[in-house]
A protein has these predicted regions:
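Short acidic-glycine-tyrosine-enriched beta hairpin
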Residues: 66-87
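Double-stranded beta-helix
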Residues: 6-13, 93-126
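A short glycine-rich, His/Asp/Glu-containing loop-to-beta-strand
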Residues: 7-50
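Glycine- and acidic-residue-biased ligand/ion/polar-headgroup-sensing regions
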Residues: 48-66
Length: 126
């Protein structure tokens, strides 16, 4: 998919809030995740996708697998940023309504769900 100059951002409703995809090319994706207070995304990992996040507003807990394989929990606030490498287990949980900017490789369907509050199961293909 190539960039479409002047195209509107695409809003995708999610059970935890919504995503606003503002860039989608064959090399990268840019989106804003709006996570409602008290909601969290799936505990997941990606087979191919590599992502970096920036907290634009709000406060969240980041669950992120470290180099030893242990999932650690860290509170992030506005201005904080992190890299989520390919294959690492992770989850975002909003303490308050949070706007998270995510820039990643373009594999939007590359999700291996390990746990989900909304009953979504399984693995999507990258």
């Amino acid at each position: 998919m190539s960039a479409d100059r002047g195209a509107s951002a695409r809003r995708v409703e999610k059970p935890w809030g919504h995503e606003l995809i503002w860039a989608h090319t064959d090399r990268y994706v840019g989106k804003i995740l709006v996570i409602e207070a008290g909601k969290r995304l799936s505990l997941q990992r990606h087979v191919v996708k590599d992502e970096s996040i920036y907290v634009a507003a709000g406060r969240l807990r980041l669950y992120l697998e470290d180099d030893s394989g242990e999932v650690r929990v860290e509170e992030l606030v506005e201005g904080d940023h992190r890299h989520v490498p390919t294959g690492r287990i992770h989850r975002y949980e909003a303490i308050e309504r949070t706007e998270l900017i995510e820039v990643s490789t373009p594999e939007l369907d590359d999700v291996v769900r390990l746990d989900d509050d909304f009953g979504r199961e399984g693995t999507s293909a990258p």
